[in-house]
């Protein structure tokens, strides 16, 4: 369900206007690893596209929940996806959270450096996603936030 190791995909595709619309959109999608409502996820990303344009590349951290649904959405829509699974000690992924430890700081930095836009979907228990939100705001990376219940 992926195009390759995250950093390799970024280096190969990250600076290209893959859909020839005149704009490069490298959309990082981050959010709760315990959120599994694909229908709502799809509505949120469709709404984002209406406002911002079609992404050339989807960037995810390789966790469960929102990250996994973003991978699935990218594949279903024939959009390349960069998955930073190399940042995890336990690279096994799936839709449901299996209690893997929090993401390393290096993952946060790679996602922020690679993205032109961020779509964040945190829940009340999201820690890492809130770090990404804070850093994106400080760096003035365009970000849209949808709080999940």
What are these regions (language model features)?
Residues 2-26, 33-149:
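Acidic/glycine-enriched connector segments
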